[in-house]
Regions:
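Axial heme c-ligation environment in periplasmic c-type cytochrome domains
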Residues: 56-63, 78-121, 156-161, 180-213
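The canonical Cys-X-X-Cys-His
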Residues: 42-50, 106, 142-152, 205
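Electrostatic cytochrome c docking/interface patches
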Residues: 23-41, 53-60, 111-138
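The feature marks the first
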Residues: 32-82, 86
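Extracellular/lumenal glycan-associated surfaces
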Residues: 66-69, 75, 160, 165-166, ...
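Bacterial N-terminal signal peptides that target proteins for export
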Residues: 1-11
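Surface-exposed interaction/gating patches
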Residues: 117-165
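Bacterial N-terminal signal peptides
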Residues: 9-20
Length: 213
């Protein structure tokens, strides 16, 4: 009886492996997220929202939804390599050791999301923000944001999507670009631009972007 039970258990295991391999071979499970990737995705959503919409609170969490995959992966790499300043609340153990494949899985997941933006910026500044975004500030040698981020702020490649980004987060990033992201790959372009913008111009840009979808 013991021999029969052992034989049966071994047969069950072999069949399970065979079916698993068959599923992989025909591609039926190719797009299923791996368990570790799924847990990372859920971890991100704990702070950035179930739809990646960001979080308004004492610690503002940026919108990740719809972000360009290349930019998303670059930022995860920057955190891991410490070329982007890390806020104290980030659990870096979750970023260090993250494989390129896992970064790609996270980027793919969030790039496909597009919930409605929170808005929240002063509406009377939206028109001014739109003008700066589309035309720049020539007298301050500030180019149009749209030149790199796209006419609708959707981003492309390594240039971030800005549409729908949380109002306070955009303000914080533009104000603190040099101190927090001085080693960023885009710093040579963005740091001088951010420094050339006045506080009122930064607020107007952030207001405009907060309503874009």
């Amino acid at each position: 009886m013991k021999f029969i039970g052992l034989h049966s258990a071994l047969l069950t295991t072999i069949l399970a492996i065979a079916f698993s391999l068959a599923g992989s071979a025909d591609g039926s499970g190719r797009n299923a997220p791996r368990p570790r990737a799924s847990s990372k995705i859920e971890y991100c959503k704990d702070c950035h929202g179930a739809s990646g919409q960001g979080y308004h609170g004492y610690l503002v969490m940026p919108r990740l939804a719809g972000q360009t995959p290349e930019y998303f992966e670059n930022q995860l790499r920057a955190f891991a390599e410490r070329t982007r300043e890390r806020a104290l609340f980030i659990n870096m153990a979750r970023v260090h050791g993250m494989s390129p494949e896992m970064r790609a899985a996270l980027a793919t997941q969030f790039s496909g999301l597009n919930p409605s933006p929170f808005g929240g910026g002063p509406r009377h500044l939206v028109a001014t923000g739109r003008q700066i975004f589309q035309e720049g500030v020539p007298e301050a040698n500030v180019p149009a944001c749209a030149a790199c981020h796209g006419p609708e702020a959707q981003g492309e490649g390594p240039n971030a999507r800005l549409a729908g980004q949380l109002f306070p987060y955009t303000i914080k990033e533009l104000k603190n670009w040099s101190s927090e992201r001085g080693a960023d790959s885009q710093a040579a372009i963005m740091a001088p631009i951010a420094r050339a913008l006045s506080e009122s111009q930064i607020v107007a840009i952030a207001a405009y972007l907060s309503y874009l979808k």
